[in-house]
Amino acid sequence: MKPEHLKLLADKDWRLNNLYWITDKEGKPTRFRMTPEQREYFEGIHTRNIILKARQLGFTTEVCIIQLDAALFESAKCALIAHTLNDAKRLFREKVKYAYDKLPAEIKAANPASNDSAGELVFKKGGSLYVSTSFRGGTLRYLHVSEFGKICAKYPDKAREIVTGAFEAVSTGCFAT
């Protein structure tokens, strides 16, 4: 790879806004580009983040892309929890796996997925991204709980499990949203 390409790949902001593809509201492929709201979140990210209920601003999409990027380029362990198994499968298939499959072949070849199963990508260099309805055990650098308010209201036992399991897997200095 050329030095100028390596320099670009070292820039997380550039990678996020140039490497990854998503589908737009009409289902058409489009390159992921942060919206002003997503940029504000990205630039102000803290180790513990709360995103108030905001429909159609693309925060879950952005977090999926951030986690995929971290798993690929930082060998980070990442997890995304959805409130139902169907939503977890859909998020994995439509956000994570779609973006991964559309990456340039050179990027995938440099750190191939050794486990590419429904709900999980595990990369040769140690990073991983797990999408399910819960997480327990291990240590995470990134955790995103989608629809946590809904989980708390509809599934209080699952919410307690997330608080005592998944949140505890995210150590100080790592990121939970």
Question: How should each PLM-predicted stretch be described?
Answer:
Residues 1-177:
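Phosphate/NTP-binding elements of NTP-utilizing enzymes
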